[in-house]
Design a protein with these regions (language model features):
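Pyridoxal 5′-phosphate
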Residues: 1-170
Length: 170
């Protein structure tokens, strides 16, 4: 039995994109949860989570978001949030982390309930500025520019290209 399908949205060795719009509905039709890893595609390949409706999404700000290491994230589809329960308790997983009442612990009602103890703030500060910068440009603009550069490379070195030739697959 399969309970969870983990899919890398983009593969680092080839740039190949996984067909999420095919995989996610197929998994859902069989009652299988989906976890999408967007570490290689965040910031360069636009995703519409309202259309795709994955159950979970993970990523980092290292690659195209240029945010540096240490700022990873977990997104949980609101439909799945109640099903998921943390295995550990952390300061920031509390509904009110500044209450300091160990006899009245309530998990936060969002994905924050999975956050552990005191986080290192530096990676998140760097990531915030980087994400804000690229958000002003727009992921579609960045994607189009990247595709133009890939087309130039594909035209000059067609025999050397490892990535798919078709732009919608890379």
């Amino acid at each position: 039995d399969v309970h969870l399908v983990l899919v890398s949205h983009a593969y680092s060795n080839s740039g190949q994109l996984a067909p999420l719009s095919d995989i996610i509905p197929m998994a859902k039709s069989r009652g299988i949860l989906t976890l999408i890893d967007i570490a290689q595609s965040a910031g360069i390949v636009p995703l519409d989570l309202n259309t795709l409706k994955p159950d979970f999404l993970i990523g980092s700000s290292v690659k195209w978001l240029c945010g540096g290491p240490g700022a990873a994230y977990l997104w949980i589809n609101p439909d799945q949030l109640q099903m998921c329960q943390p295995k550990d308790v952390g300061w920031f997983s509390h509904d009110n982390p500044f209450e300091f009442d160990i006899h009245d612990f309530r998990f936060h009602n969002s994905a924050l309930k999975f956050w552990g103890g005191t986080p290192s703030i530096a990676p998140y500060v760097i990531a915030k500025h980087s994400i804000d910068y690229f958000a002003k440009i727009g992921s579609q603009e960045i994607r189009e520019h990247n595709q133009q550069l890939m087309n130039l490379i594909a035209g000059e070195f067609p025999d050397k290209l490892i990535s798919p030739i078709e732009p919608h697959q890379r």
